[in-house]
């Protein structure tokens, strides 16, 4: 234990948590594989979530996990809203089968509103992920977490520009995996 700015610090080992995070994130990214991809994504998400929870506790930064949890809940809300609008649009198109103009207008307007609402929710969710990675970067003195969070957030903002946003999200995901595996095994934690 050392003294740093009148606050005692101690070195803590985060090697298990960073491995869980890195492996979990890789598994989440394998969701596109037919058949087993969904299972890999779920297992990966659980590993990543455990990693973020444990890092939050070990580093004495509860806001890391709080922000991850808020982002996750917002992502779920966004998916539920998208699904609800999709179902409502489908049902309304059947209800107006005799009136093609009304059906097309209602369906189009529903899709536009749903996209705007979901886009706004996803932006807020990605902002909270970015904030969590900023805190993690500061706590571990490993700036790749901050860079990954920024790339993911900018990617979410620019996703409406088709390829650019998707490309930034892909790069952000790769940087995040690298950040987990290259983070230091031991870090200084302030407090008792």
Can you annotate each of these PLM segments?
Residues 83-87, 101, 105, 111:
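Extended assembly-interface regions of large multimeric machines
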Residues 34-35, 160-164:
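Membrane-interface helix caps and helix-loop-helix hairpins in membrane proteins
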Residues 94-106, 158:
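Flexible coil/linker segments and helix-coil junctions enriched in charged and small residues
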Residues 80-97:
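Membrane-helix interface motif
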Residues 105-122, 159-162:
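Hydrophobic alpha-helical transmembrane segments
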Residues 2-32, 40-81, 101, 121-156, ...:
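Membrane-interface extramembranous regions at the lipid-water interface
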